[in-house]
Each structure stands twice: as structure tokens, then as C-alpha cells.
């Protein structure tokens, strides 16, 4: 399925706000992925749904030759600015992970951190992963699990949001071992591990201020609502975190994620 209208909206939504503020809350995921993928000098590394470049920058500092692709033009522009400021050479491009304008077997490593999981056509995305990685090459993905804290946050948001188009895959299915095996098991030898990433802030209100200003899905949804409904969303958000995640005087949002490592057959 093409889902072109949804992806057009996603390309704007994900670029709505300074996403780099949110990537700072998943530093542990980026660090573990780059450590486990362990690039060698000159390895061709593709970072899919690269956002503002947090993973791409890490890979480039390790000596990889990095290409970063994201659906959102605004995120790519920020990523380019960040690379220039840091003196890093990274080839950033706007592109669709379901239909990449890249050669077969062009990359030693492909990564995505909480990124490709949001593409609606899971089978097309998995097919592109298998196509662009060379035989013996590696993939590394960090995907939020369906039982974890991010999925629960999105469930809290659901009553305020329009329904997804029919046939669009749930992003959190990418955090299910069974689903990932079904998508990638024929092409990759897989290793799957569950981990917990913690986001700690002083209060539910602080969490709201961060995500309603910087996280595309939350910011875009809030901006789409009238004043009364937006305040209902705001209050539901604060109550959700205060009721479920307050611990030792702060909000401790434990977010389970699935580390997917694979070697291309």
C-alpha cells in the first residue's frame, strides 16, 4: 500500500518543532546501537529516518561514510546545519524508507532509532532494508515495544487524534519479536534484546512543555485542536504521567525498546 497522503502529513509533522530536543532523551539508545554495530573506518552506513542526525553523527565520528535519509525536509535541513557546525561530512537526503532511491547492496550497515517503525507499510520497509544492505552486512534498529511506556503514551493520545488510515501498520509492532522475525527473518540472522530507556523530568507539566514544543506528533496534535480540546489533552497528558510515572520526587518514564541486530544472508 502506498499511504501517500499519510506520508505527506508525516513529512510535515515530524519536522514540526526542534526534534533535537527529544533525541537528547534517547542518547542511551543511540550509544548502544553504535557500540553494537561497531563500524570500521570507511564502512558505508545508512541511517534511516535519521531525524536531526544524532545517530548519523555518532557513526561519522567512528569513521563510517554516512548517508542519512529522512522523510521530513525540515529535519534534514537541521541535520545538515548540525553536521556543518561539527565539521562532519554526512550525505543527508530527503527520502522515503519504503522506496529508497539507493542502489542494491550499497551499505555495510543500516540503522534506525525509533524511526522506520513509524512508516505505515512494514513489509515495504523491511524489503528495502534487505535490498540496500550487502550480503554479510548488518542492521541495527531501536524500536519501542507494544507493551512499553511510549506505546502507553500514544494510547493516551489516541482519543484526541484522528484514526490512522485503514491498513497502516502499528509502529509498535516493530517492537514485537514475532513481528520482526516475520518481517526480517528470511533475509537476516537476527538477535533481539529488550532494554529500558528512562526519561526523567521534574513533573508531568515539564514533560508536556518538552513534547508539546519539540515532539512532532504531540505538537502537531495539540495545534490541531481547539482551545478547549487542547486543554483537555494537556490535562490528560499531565495526569497520565503524574498518575503512572511519579517516583522519588520526579517523573520517571520507563520506555521499553527492542534492540534488533541482524546480519544479511
Mark where each language-model region is:
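Conserved class I S-adenosyl-L-methionine
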Residues: 1-43, 54, 78, 154, ...
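A generic alpha-to-beta junction signature in SAM-dependent methyltransferases
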Residues: 37-39, 60, 133, 184
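Class I SAM-dependent methyltransferase SAM/SAH-binding core
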Residues: 44-100, 124
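A short SAM/SAH-binding and catalytic strip from SAM-dependent methyltransferases
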Residues: 109-122
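Conserved catalytic/acceptor-binding region of the Class I
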Residues: 123-124, 130, 134-203, 222, ...
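Conserved Class I S-adenosyl-L-methionine
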Residues: 172-265
Amino acid at each position: 500500500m502506498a499511504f501517500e497522503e499519510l506520508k505527506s502529513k508525516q513529512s510535515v509533522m515530524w519536522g514540526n518543532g526542534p526534534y533535537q530536543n527529544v533525541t537528547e532523551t534517547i542518547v542511551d539508545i543511540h550509544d548502544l546501537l553504535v557500540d553494537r554495530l561497531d563500524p570500521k573506518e570507511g564502512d558505508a552506513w545508512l541511517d534511516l529516518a535519521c531525524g536531526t542526525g544524532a545517530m548519523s553523527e555518532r557513526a561519522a565520528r567512528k569513521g563510517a561514510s554516512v548517508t542519512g535519509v529522512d522523510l521530513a525536509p525540515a529535519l534534514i535541513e537541521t541535520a545538515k546545519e548540525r553536521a556543518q557546525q561539527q565539521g562532519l561530512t554526512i550525505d543527508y537526503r530527503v527520502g522515503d524508507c519504503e522506496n529508497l532511491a539507493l542502489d542494491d547492496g550499497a551499505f555495510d550497515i543500516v540503522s534506525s532509532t525509533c524511526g522506520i517503525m513509524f512508516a505505515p507499510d512494514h513489509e515495504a520497509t523491511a524489503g528495502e532494508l534487505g535490498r540496500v544492505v550487502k550480503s554479510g552486512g548488518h542492521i541495527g534498529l531501536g524500536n519501542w515495544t507494544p507493551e512499553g511506556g511510549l506505546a502507553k503514551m500514544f494510547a493516551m493520545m489516541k482519543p484526541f487524534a484522528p484514526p490512522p488510515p485503514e491498513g497502516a501498520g502499528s509502529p509498535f509492532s516493530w517492537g514485537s519479536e514475532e513481528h520482526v522475525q516475520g518481517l526480517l527473518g528470511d533475509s537476516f540472522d537476527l538477535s533481539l534484546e529488550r532494554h529500558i530507556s528512562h526519561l526523567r523530568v521534574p513533573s508531568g507539566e515539564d514533560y508536556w512543555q518538552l513534547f508539546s514544543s519539540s515532539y512532532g506528533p504531540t505538537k502537531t496534535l495539540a495545534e490541531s485542536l481547539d482551545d478547549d480540546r487542547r486543554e483537555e489533552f494537556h490535562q490528560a497528558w499531565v495526569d497520565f504521567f503524574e498518575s503512572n510515572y511519579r517516583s522519588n520526587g520526579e517523573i520517571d518514564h520507563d520506555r521499553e525498546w527492542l534492540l534488533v541486530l541482524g546480519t544479511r544472508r
